[in-house]
Amino acid sequence: MRILVISDTHGELGNFLKVMDIEKKVDLCVHLGDIEGQENEIADLVSCPLFAVRGNNDFFSPLPYDIDVKIGPYQAFLTHGHHYGISVGEGGVLEEARARGANLVMFGHTHRPVLREEEGIILVNPGSISYPRQEDRKPSYMIITINERNGKAEFEQKFLKS
C-alpha cells in the first residue's frame, strides 16, 4: 500500500500536479489541512480514497478537525495541529495521540517536515508542497509504503526539485 501524505496546499494545485506526475499511483491520500476548498479536485486527481482534515485556513469547510483511522499496522491520528499548539511544539499532539491510543500522528500547519519517533509514537509532518518554511524552502511531501505481507512501513520524506 502506497500512501501520499500532503499538507498546506493553500489552494495551489501546481506542485500537487507535479507530485502526482512523479508518484503516479497511490492507494490512499492524506491531506492534513489548509486545503482551502479543493478537497473534491484533489480527490479526483488521486483517484483513490482521501482522508482530509480541516486546517486553520479552511474557514467554511465541512471537513473534520481530526480523524482517527487504522492505516496498515498503525492506529493513526490525523490533524492539522493548530488546536494542539503545534506552532510552539509537538507536546500537544503527542498528548492527544496518547489519549486516543494512536501510535502514529500526522499533522501539518508548520510547513516544516518532521519524521521522528517519540515514546512509541511516530510523528509525521510532510511539510508543504506550496509554501515550505524549512531552511532550504523545497516543497515537500511524504510517501508511506506499507508491506502488505509483514505490515512493515517505510516512511520517505520527499522534496520537489526547484
Q: Language-model segments: which ranges?
A:
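Helix-adjacent hinge/juxtasegments
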Residues: 51-101
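Active-site neighborhood of phospho(di)ester-bond hydrolases with catalytic His/Asp-centered motifs
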Residues: 5-7, 28-33, 51-56, 78-80, ...
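Active-site environment of divalent metal-dependent phosphoester hydrolases
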Residues: 10-14, 35-40, 57-62, 84-88, ...
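Catalytic core of the metallo-beta-lactamase
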Residues: 80, 84-117, 123, 129, ...
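Glycine-enriched alpha-helix->loop->beta-strand junction motifs that scaffold or abut catalytic
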Residues: 47-50, 120-122
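Binuclear metal-dependent phosphoesterase catalytic core
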Residues: 17, 72, 95-101, 124-162
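N-terminal active-site segment of His-dependent metallophosphoesterases
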Residues: 1-49, 58-65, 137-140, 144-149
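Short secondary-structure boundary/capping segments
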Residues: 42, 66-70, 96-97, 113-115, ...
